[in-house]
Amino acid sequence: MDYAKELLEQSGWKDTDGDGIREKDGNKLAFHLMYFAGDSMRQAVAMSVANQAKENLGFDITVEGVSEDDTIKRMFSEPMIMGWGSDSPMTSYMLFHSSNAGKTDWYNPEFYMSDKTDEYLDKAMNSLTIEDSYEWWQKAQWDGETGTSMKGEAPWAFFVNMTHLYYVKDGLNIGNQRIHAHGQAWPLIANLAEWSWE
């Protein structure tokens, strides 16, 4: 938070009237944050982001539930709480490769484009083994100068990692579980062949 406050101060966003909201050149640091109407989880995340950003940084964020049709009209110019999750790095390719910029499939609505990131993502996708691809996926995130992570250009701000909770019958061993991505297939049973009764 200290770094964010420092950046805001350096760029001229200050609370000069004492109302808790930063302003610059007479404009309040205020905007809408959309989420899909009817999605209580994303609504809760949006409200939490708005409350914490106001309390800690001086943002005035209005949370707004919108329809999919409204989202398509506004997603290229206004922030939106989205939900992503995958156990495949292909999601990174879809989110950050310039070939996906501006499509209405929800992957790259911010029109993120970077020749360097494209180069790394293409090298990762063309690697002969998953192990060979790791270097390129990581460099796409941060290569020491640029990338898609918070150290770099951060076209996406990732706020939450969901934790999954399962009840398992006594005596059932479900083996070593991999990371369970948000809303993606059935990761719980991906290792079903390893399950056993004890």
Question: Which sequence ranges carry the predicted segments?
Answer:
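Detector for C-terminal structural segments
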Residues: 3-4, 41-50, 72-198
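Ligand/substrate-recognition segments at binding pockets and active sites
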Residues: 14-86, 164
